[in-house]
Amino acid sequence: MARNKLIAKLTSEELRQLNAQTISHYQRSAYEFAEATEQHDVSQNIEALLRNMKGVGPYNILDLGCGPGRDLLTFKTLGHCPIGLDGCAEFVALARARTECEVLHQDFLNLNLESMAFDGVFANASLFHVPTQELERVLCDIQSCLKVDGVFFCSNPRGSDTEQFNGDRYGAFLEID
């Protein structure tokens, strides 16, 4: 993969500001986002995670970047034990109210997850908000919360190795080799 040249290495303060700006975007548009994405069909992504899980469920699943809880509710309805995680307080409140599941209020750059707690981690269209310079560290944090033989599913919008703001929302759009 070609190295991104658009955003230079960021300081910890610049990372904090970038992260806060993106979360603030979702805070301001949480209800509109929930409505706009309610009917998105991600069943093939959910099935991809579940068919690769070992053993017999129900599974402990972390929905990383759960937003308003659409996929969290699907996992619960399927009989699993999902926990959500989102950096946006409005999404956390919406997801808790909608699903009655535990939802952690954490952002990707400051994860504090229990070691080996999950059979699976589902990150659907969320980790593209992690700056590429932090991605390896964040992936290591995710790996540490997975049980032995745990499954990590990640889906992100593709791009041409660019990091940019779309309005006030940061995204890293990577080319797949």
Spans of features found by a protein language model:
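A general, composition-driven signal for non-globular sequence regions
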Residues: P58, L64, A123-S126
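Class I (Rossmann-like) S-adenosyl-L-methionine-dependent methyltransferase catalytic domain
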Residues: A2-I61, P68-N112, Q133-R137, D141, ...
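A short acidic, Gly/Pro-enriched loop at the edge of an enzyme's catalytic core
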Residues: L109-V121
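A short SAM/SAH-binding and catalytic strip from SAM-dependent methyltransferases
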Residues: G120-E134
